[in-house]
Amino acid sequence: MNVVTVPGEMKDHKVLVYALSTCVWCKRTKEFLKDRKVHYEYVDVDLASPEDRKRIEDDLRRLNCYSYPAVLIDDRRLIVGFKLNDLKEALELR
């Protein structure tokens, strides 16, 4: 799986973004995190190999996640969609 790391000063939380390369809300979510200097990783699911894509989609389905972006924080909280207030709260941002 091609996971991309975006370095940032804020490393208080483990953040993984599941995105689609063509999704404007996914792009905005990644920009939001980068602008706030959050260290995070992302994977563009539509660009993953067929095997990786199936595994990712199966994992997300088990979490009742059927849309993007999906932001997994600290391996326990999942935020689905472009929800800035939820991201700010979960990441303790202003």
Language-model features: where?
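Thioredoxin-like thiol-disulfide oxidoreductase module
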Residues: V45-Y66, L91-L93
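Short alpha-helical
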Residues: V24, E51, D86
